[in-house]
Amino acid sequence: MKCPKCGSLNDKVLETRQSKEGVVIKRRRECLNCGYRFTTYERIEEEHIEVIKKNNTVEPFNKEKIIRGILLASKNRPITQEQIKQIADDIEKYLLDEGKLKVSSAEIGDLVKNRLKELDPVSYLRFVSVFDGFEDIKDFEEFIKSFEKKI
């Protein structure tokens, strides 16, 4: 570790302690060049998911956007806030577990659709109609016909 006083890279660790929560390691170090003592902290760097939008811009993953989208689609439907939050948490966990740190908004939308399809067909239809950009009643009719064939 580089000494903040003299810039030397030679140091020794005098003491190591783990935080009560177990998420941070604190190390007391001493520079072997100038004798200066300093503290460093070590923590796990969280991975951040990036979302590639339809227009190819990239933005940080925002679980709240999933929650808002599902809330709109499930308004006045028998879906609880806890279920909605769980869907968003599950999607984030899935992406991290699979190592998908760059993911398209379309893939996230598909993950939401799959969960809503299982949970509530009306909320699913509402979500799909907005996400897929239905323009008129024909889009709904075609979707419902294809949906009924799959059931």
UniProtKB/Swiss-Prot annotation:
Domain ATP-cone residues, every copy: 49-139
Alphabetically ordered keywords of this record: ATP-binding, DNA-binding, Metal-binding, Nucleotide-binding, Repressor, Transcription, Transcription regulation, Zinc, Zinc-finger
Co-factor(s): Zn(2+)
Cofactor binding, per record: Binds 1 zinc ion.
GO terms under biological process: negative regulation of DNA-templated transcription
Stated role: Negatively regulates transcription of bacterial ribonucleotide reductase nrd genes and operons by binding to NrdR-boxes.
Name used for this protein in its record: Transcriptional repressor NrdR
Organism: Sulfurihydrogenibium sp. (strain YO3AOP1)
Organismal lineage: Bacteria, Pseudomonadati, Aquificota, Aquificia, Aquificales
Gene that produces this protein: nrdR
